[in-house]
């Protein structure tokens, strides 16, 4: 299966964890709102993102939501659609 677009949103009250998660998500996609990223992921990258995010999150306080985007994305206002780019996880 190829890459598909996901919207990844988070709500994290702790500044340190929030910054760490945002930095992690920057390596997978593009920030489109303060706490929302758009990421093109295949199954391997999606599982890698989940695994790495679990290490950063406090599951009793934090929320991370990963939404697969079906169909075309429409943008009203400013902001381009995310580009499909090659992601390398080290």
Swiss-Prot record:
One Gene Ontology biological process: maintenance of CRISPR repeat elements
Cofactor comment: Divalent cations; Mn(2+) is slightly preferred over Mg(2+).
EC number in record: 3.1.-.-
Regulation: Inhibited by EDTA and at pH 6.0.
SUPFAM superfamilies on file: TTP0101/SSO1404-like (SSF143430)
Residues annotated as binding Mg(2+): 11
Cystine connections: none
Top-level EC class as recorded in UniProt: hydrolase
Top-rank lineage group of the source organism: Bacteria
Gene Ontology molecular function: metal ion binding; RNA endonuclease activity
Function: CRISPR (clustered regularly interspaced short palindromic repeat), is an adaptive immune system that provides protection against mobile genetic elements (viruses, transposable elements and conjugative plasmids). CRISPR clusters contain sequences complementary to antecedent mobile elements and target invading nucleic acids. CRISPR clusters are transcribed and processed into CRISPR RNA (crRNA). Involved in the integration of spacer DNA into the CRISPR cassette. Functions as a dsDNA endonuclease and as a weak ssRNase.
PANTHER family per the UniProt record, alphabetical: CRISPR-ASSOCIATED ENDORIBONUCLEASE CAS2, CRISPR-ASSOCIATED ENDORIBONUCLEASE CAS2 3
Subunit structure: Homodimer, forms a heterotetramer with a Cas1 homodimer.
Similarity comment text for this entry: Belongs to the CRISPR-associated endoribonuclease Cas2 protein family.
HAMAP family membership: Cas2
Name of the protein in its database record: CRISPR-associated endonuclease Cas2 2
Species for this entry: Thermus thermophilus (strain ATCC BAA-163 / DSM 7039 / HB27)
């Amino acid at each position: 299966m190829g890459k598909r677009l996901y919207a990844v949103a988070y709500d994290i009250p702790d500044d340190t964890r929030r910054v760490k998660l945002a930095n992690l998500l920057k390596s997978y996609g593009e920030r489109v709102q303060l706490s929302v990223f758009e990421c093109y992921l295949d199954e391997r990258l999606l599982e890698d993102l989940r695994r790495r995010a679990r290490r950063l999150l406090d599951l009793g306080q934090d929320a991370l939501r990963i939404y697969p985007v079906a169909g075309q994305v429409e943008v009203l206002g400013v902001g381009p659609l995310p580009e499909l780019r090659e992601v390398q996880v080290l």
